[in-house]
Amino acid sequence: LLGRIHRFGDVVQSVHMARQFGIKNINMDLIFGLPTQTADDWKQTLNDVLSISPDHISAYGLIPEEGTSLFQALENGTLSLPDPDLERNMYDCAISMLHAAGLYQYEISNFASPGKECRHNIGYWTQVPYLGLGLSAASMIRCPDRDNQTDPFSIRWTNPSSFDGYYAMLEQDGIPEEIKETISPEEARFETVMLSLRMTSGMHRGDFLQLHGEYPEKWYGEILYRLKGQGLLELRDDSWCLTRRGMDLQNSVLVEFMN
């Protein structure tokens, strides 16, 4: 259905081999909301995966990608996606079963044993600067010496995808950047909201202050307290966090901040 070349038995074998070679933190990516998939199918998938005790699980709702055979089958009506309520029930089922198995939810789609969270992704969600080396790699740095709220917050760039282009830029000035984007303070504040609210720990007010020079209420106070009154956000341990209902309606919540 998804064009994968492996079966579950191959996955089990790969996990066992990884452990034999000393790898102690193993993640498994799962997709729910597939055409023809039932709630019982999804429960069986979760039980099968939990039987090999992964340290980390990422569970994503299916997003059909244009150009794939699955996308074409959905377009011409050969296949259809499950009802949104069924997909939401599958998500709730994953949260419940994974929590019972000792994998706590630390981000909308990610679950881990304590101490086994994905530090790589957490870096993106908390806007930690990063340097990408090689073809098509992306980088982000904060602008130094920012002294007011109008200076650019950060710069992002992407390296060329072809070796010839990459090498030519290295020879020319030593900086192989193909796409460069300057992030304004306003854009950076929204990205902080968007990324931090993905995490169950939420948007810590002190962290926002350190990044942007003011608490989030300066720019978003009316929105934050309105969403809190609607039961979509809560203020917990000095952090603004999505409630369980807010996680279901995350896209609608973010639209409020975009407006």
Regions found by a protein language model. Give the residues of each.
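A short, conserved structural fragment
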Residues: 228-238
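Short, amphipathic alpha-helical interaction segments positioned at domain boundaries
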Residues: 245-259
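C-terminal scaffold of the Radical SAM
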Residues: 1-214
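Short amphipathic alpha-helical interaction segments
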Residues: 214-228
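Minor-groove-contacting beta-hairpin "wing" of winged helix-turn-helix DNA-binding domains
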Residues: 239-243
